[in-house]
Amino acid sequence: MRRVIAQGTFDILHPGHVHYLSDAASLGDELHVIIARGENVTHKPKPILDGRQRRDMVAALDVVDEAHLGHVEDIFVPIEEIDPDVIVLGYDQHHDEDGIKAALDARGIDCEVTRATPRELRHDDELLSTGRIIDRIVERRC
């Protein structure tokens, strides 16, 4: 059984998230998704929804076998527990593949690290980013 991990914030689910997770699921038999805890999100604004809500939404997607909240102090703990064959990064996630691979190697975790493919726009006004969705909400509702 080939075990795959995808990870992210997943605040306000959108078609880009669904594509990422579907792409990741296609690379194995079992997809585990690690949901970043709000306190660990440092590269962009903190999530609007709490971790449990984001985890439950991701878990409801058919392609996801299990959704996990990330560890409060050490983002690699869930990876060690799941013991994946491959970690799939989002095509535009800020993580450095080589840096992740080096950190995994240092912990004795032997798995492939790859990137998901980008999702092509299907409509001119399609939004594939939580930030752009929030901008549109502010523009139209405030």
UniProtKB/Swiss-Prot annotation:
ATP binds at residues 9-10, 14-17, 92. It is an enzyme of class 2 (transferase). GO terms for molecular function: ATP binding; FMN adenylyltransferase activity. The keyword Nucleotidyltransferase applies. Gene3D superfamilies: HUPs. SUPFAM superfamilies: Nucleotidylyl transferase. Keywords: ATP-binding, FAD, Flavoprotein, FMN, Nucleotide-binding, Nucleotidyltransferase, Transferase. It holds the Pfam family CTP_transf_like. The keyword Flavoprotein applies. Its cofactor is a divalent metal cation. InterPro entries: Archaeal_FAD_synthase (IPR050385), Cyt_trans-like (IPR004821), FAD_synth_RibL (IPR024902), Rossmann-like_a/b/a_fold (IPR014729). Pathway: Cofactor biosynthesis; FAD biosynthesis; FAD from FMN: step 1/1. Transmembrane segments: none annotated. Its EC number is 2.7.7.2. Belongs to the archaeal FAD synthase family. Homodimer. This is FAD synthase. It comes from Haloferax volcanii (strain ATCC 29605 / DSM 3757 / JCM 8879 / NBRC 14742 / NCIMB 2012 / VKM B-1768 / DS2) (Halobacterium volcanii). The gene is ribL.
